[in-house]
């Protein structure tokens, strides 16, 4: 089996509105730089342990940095804790979901262009030249989907989203395991 036997969905021609994928790491570094230029203090390598939202005064954030608990006060709080979901858990904003999934992702240096995965000219010419490279490509099968996203930084984002009832998280929860998982499930 090669890539040309897979189902392909998406536009055959470029869309009238130009767009591109944002490299999240590049964006985050840029935002960090802008924040520091505005005089904000950014504490990398810290872990928030508690947030107190105080309606009539500055909010209080407790965090651990270098094994020491510290506190700061601030006017605004934005939860960027990822899966820890500090504010969502504290204020019980979570809602039960019927669909459960886990995800892993990473970036590879360099460009992955799925057009290069076959020499079949009829498949390559089915879409406007370069269109697959400008797209988020998803490979789907029972209980999972895998993405390949070319980034403006000339790197590629790869990710796996899977139902734990079909693909236990422990089988792909590290880079090394994810590569082995792909060899079994997506040998293309």
Where are the model-predicted features located?
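Conserved N-terminal/central alpha/beta ligand/cofactor-binding core
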Residues: 1-47
């Amino acid at each position: 089996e090669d890539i040309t036997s897979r189902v392909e969905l998406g536009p055959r021609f470029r869309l009238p509105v130009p767009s591109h994928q944002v490299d999240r790491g590049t964006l985050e570094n840029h935002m960090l730089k802008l924040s520091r230029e505005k005089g904000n203090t950014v504490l990398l390598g810290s872990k928030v342990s508690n947030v107190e939202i105080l309606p009539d005064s500055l909010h209080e954030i407790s965090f651990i940095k270098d094994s020491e608990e510290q506190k700061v006060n601030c006017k605004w709080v934005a939860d960027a804790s990822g899966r820890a979901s500090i504010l969502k858990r504290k204020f019980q904003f979570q809602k039960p979901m019927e669909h459960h999934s886990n995800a892993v992702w990473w970036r590879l240096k360099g460009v992955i262009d799925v057009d290069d995965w076959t020499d079949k000219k009829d498949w390559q010419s089915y879409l406007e030249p370069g269109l697959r490279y400008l797209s988020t490509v998803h490979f789907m099968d029972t209980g999972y989907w895998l993405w390949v996203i070319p980034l403006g930084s000339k790197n590629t984002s790869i990710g796996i989203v899977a139902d734990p009832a079909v693909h236990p998280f422990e089988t792909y929860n590290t880079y090394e395991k994810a590569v082995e998982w792909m060899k079994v499930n997506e040998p293309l």
